[in-house]
Amino acid sequence: MLEQDIQKILYSENDIIRKTKKLGEQLTKDYQEKNPLMIGVLKGSVPFMAELMKHIDTHVEIDFMVVSSYHGGTSSSGEVKILKDVDTNIEGRDIIIVEDIIDTGRTLKYLRDMFKYRKANTIKIATLFDKPEGRVVKIEADYVCYNIPNEFIVGFGLDYAENYRNLPYVGVLKEEVYSK
């Protein structure tokens, strides 16, 4: 039923798992004996973070934040709001911010600056998708599974109006669906 709204599938579930496994192996090497704190940006990061954690073979703690700059639409409002902050004290910690997609970069720049202010030891960004064409602020991810074109994608945590997150793959949403 949801598939009728998808223009094309970009990445299958198996494609995503393969890339995520490779990233997990890299994080294992980079954070051996460091006990990093992975902070997932809800809601979109949940499938990616859950898959990623399965492939990290070192100690890691997790926490979550709810941050929004979209407020239900298809384009960023430009205003970043923290709706739920982390519960963990991050001072002196090695932080890995886990995000489903980097588009404008505003949210991640805001979080990185906030964690610097809170005296995190290191701050790295891991994302499933990076959309450099959408960037309006200067920020780069440290770990990227896929660079993608400037298309509206959904699935594997990515949504349109809180729908399509449950698709096991990532596809391009038909324009007529979000331009109504």
From Swiss-Prot:
Subcellular location, principal: cytoplasm
Query: What InterPro entries does the entry give?
Result: HGPRT, Hxn_phspho_trans, PRibTrfase_dom, PRTase-like
Give any Gene Ontology cellular component.
cytosol
According to UniProt, this protein's pathway is: Purine metabolism; IMP biosynthesis via salvage pathway; IMP from hypoxanthine: step 1/1; Purine metabolism; GMP biosynthesis via salvage pathway; GMP from guanine: step 1/1
Task: Give me the disulphide-bonded residues.
Answer: none
Intracellular or extracellular location(s): Cytoplasm
What reaction does this catalyse?
Answer: IMP + diphosphate = hypoxanthine + 5-phospho-alpha-D-ribose 1-diphosphate; GMP + diphosphate = guanine + 5-phospho-alpha-D-ribose 1-diphosphate
Source organism superkingdom: Bacteria
**Function recorded in the entry:** Purine salvage pathway enzyme that catalyzes the transfer of the ribosyl-5-phosphate group from 5-phospho-alpha-D-ribose 1-diphosphate (PRPP) to the N9 position of the 6-oxopurines hypoxanthine and guanine to form the corresponding ribonucleotides IMP (inosine 5'-monophosphate) and GMP (guanosine 5'-monophosphate), with the release of PPi.
Q: What is this protein called?
A: Hypoxanthine-guanine phosphoribosyltransferase
UniProt source species: Streptococcus pyogenes serotype M6 (strain ATCC BAA-946 / MGAS10394)
What is this protein's gene name? hpt
